[in-house]
Curated annotation (Swiss-Prot):
It catalyses: a ubiquinone + n Na(+)(in) + NADH + H(+) = a ubiquinol + n Na(+)(out) + NAD(+). The gene is nqrA. Its EC number is 7.2.1.1. GO terms for biological process: sodium ion transport. It comes from Neisseria meningitidis serogroup B (strain ATCC BAA-335 / MC58). This is Na(+)-translocating NADH-quinone reductase subunit A. Belongs to the NqrA family. It comes from the Bacteria. GO terms for molecular function: oxidoreductase activity, acting on NAD(P)H, quinone or similar compound as acceptor. Pfam families: NQRA_2nd, NQRA_N, NQRA_SLBB. Keywords: Ion transport, NAD, Sodium, Sodium transport, Translocase, Transport, Ubiquinone. Composed of six subunits; NqrA, NqrB, NqrC, NqrD, NqrE and NqrF. NQR complex catalyzes the reduction of ubiquinone-1 to ubiquinol by two successive reactions, coupled with the transport of Na(+) ions from the cytoplasm to the periplasm. NqrA to NqrE are probably involved in the second step, the conversion of ubisemiquinone to ubiquinol.
Length: 447
């Protein structure tokens, strides 16, 4: 077992009950274009078109052959675009059960599939988009080969679902999905799980299981990659989430694209935090209807540390998100708040009484408690960064855009989620995720 000591388990109220309930009926789903780094769509549908589940909606011009398919049947209700015509979302009004059928295989045939058969079925169904590269966190080219594939079967994000609960319901599909991935490449398939977690595996020669323990970010793929198979400019691995492995197993067994998602609905503003069964790209406001405390709330697709605000054209469950988090908007200001003992506020430093209340869960809000200021290196980054890098120096380089130094310090190993805790504890109120993405784009473009 690999056990990390540095990190932070956020003591946030509203942890979900680890039992799966059926979610509300969903009448709108969408694909969010801005989730896919560097993607430039070539649209295959227009508003008003009828589509089947599994039908191609658009293709990536920059990554030919990579297609994005409909998560449900219905009609194209809207195609939202932002500045410079950036694709924001393709919205489908759900109607009927029409679907496209893909190749299916008998269970005993899965172990003999060729890599080309696996690749073709994943690409045609749109499940190729479940894979992401590291470095750069982009969808791999259809003819690319990884050094390894990392299956993330754990989650240490605040308010997250316990993957073992979800995998237990679909253990055979998960095992079939692992077997399919083992046929995609001859390289290692690293299945990463929490210490002592009951996660099934397959006996394929290239599948290895690893256990991780410790606080968040022990459950992030970036942490797993760093300790098992570090990447660099000339070494790429792929990552995939456990729920997508289940979906792949179902696709190859049935020939049908199953877009079911089990998500955690949690946070201090949720009346009954629990796990809900819904669909990929579901309209978030329909999921949360009647579920929230009647105040000014911020609804987030994903983790409170690194999720996306859901509103307007973005009011949909993200492709790579397994949770919806809800916290209160922090719009009020406090007079001389820094003088008060503040037992109801959490701080990683010893600046509030709440820091010393070890077993208390706090009702967090969106207030940042101060304005923008200079980056202050007081050791907080080092306390939450378990990777063997120099976080203060790296974060400084991200701020000034020094790509050469950032690359030398290990930025190619990282994704936005890997720096979310650094943003949370930053006295200067910097958001390091967008800064990292900007530097990665520059490195990819200019070298």
């Amino acid at each position: 077992m690999i056990k990390i000591k540095k990190g932070l388990n956020l003591p946030i109220a509203g942890r979900p009950e680890q039992a799966v309930y059926d979610g509300p009926a969903i009448t709108e789903v969408a694909l969010l274009g801005e989730e896919y780094a560097g993607m430039r769509p070539s649209m295959k549908v227009k508003e008003g078109d009828a589509v089947k589940k599994g039908q191609v909606l658009f293709e990536d011009k920059k990554n030919p052959g990579v297609v994005f398919t409909a998560p449900a049947s219905g009609k194209i209700a809207a195609i939202h675009r932002g500045e410079k015509r950036v694709l924001q979302s393709v919205v489908i009004a759900v109607e009927g059960n029409d679907e496209i059928e893909f190749e299916r295989y008998a269970p005993e045939a899965l172990a003999n599939l060729s890599g080309e058969e696996v690749r073709r079925n994943l690409i045609q169904s749109g499940l190729w988009t479940a894979l992401r590269t590291r470095p750069f966190s982009k969808i791999p080219a259809v003819d690319a080969e990884p050094f390894a594939i990392f299956v993330n079967a754990m989650d240490t994000n605040p308010l997250a679902a316990d993957p073992t609960v979800i995998i237990k319901e679909a253990a055979e599909d998960f095992k079939r999905g692992l077997l399919v991935l083992s046929r995609l490449t001859e390289r290692k398939i690293h299945v990463c799980k929490a210490a002592g977690a009951d996660v099934p595996s397959e006996n394929a020669a290239n599948i290895e299981t690893h256990e991780f323990g410790g606080p968040h970010p022990a459950g992030l793929s970036g942490t797993h990659i760093h300790f098992i198979e570090p990447v660099g400019a000339n070494k790429t691995v792929w990552t995939i989430n456990y729920q997508d492995v289940i979906t792949i197993g179902r696709l190859f067994a049935t020939g049908r694209l199953n877009t079911e998602r089990v998500i955690a609905l949690g946070g201090s503003q949720v009346n009954k935090p629990r796990l809900l069964r819904t669909v990929l790209g579901a309209k978030v406001s329909q999921i949360t209807a009647g579920e929230l405390v009647d105040t000014d709330n911020r609804v987030i697709s994903g983790s409170v540390l690194n999720g996306a605000i859901t509103q307007g054209a973005h009011d949909y469950l993200g492709r790579y998100h397994n949770q919806i988090s809800v916290i209160e908007e922090g719009r009020s200001k406090e007079l001389f708040g820094w003088v008060a003992p503040q037992p109801d506020k959490y701080s990683i430093t010893r600046t509030t009484l709440g820091h010393f209340l070890k077993n208390k869960l706090f009702k967090f809000n969106t207030a940042v408690n101060g304005g923008d200021r200079a980056m202050v290196p007081i050791g907080t980054y080092e306390r939450v960064m378990p990777l063997d890098i120099l976080p203060t120096l790296l974060l400084r380089d991200l701020i000034v855009g020094d790509t050469d130094s950032a690359q030398a310090l290990g930025c190619l190993e990282l994704d936005e989620e890997d720096l979310a805790l650094c943003s949370f504890v930053c006295p200067g109120k910097y958001e390091y995720g967008p800064l990292l993405r900007k530097v990665l784009e520059t490195i990819e473009k200019e070298g």
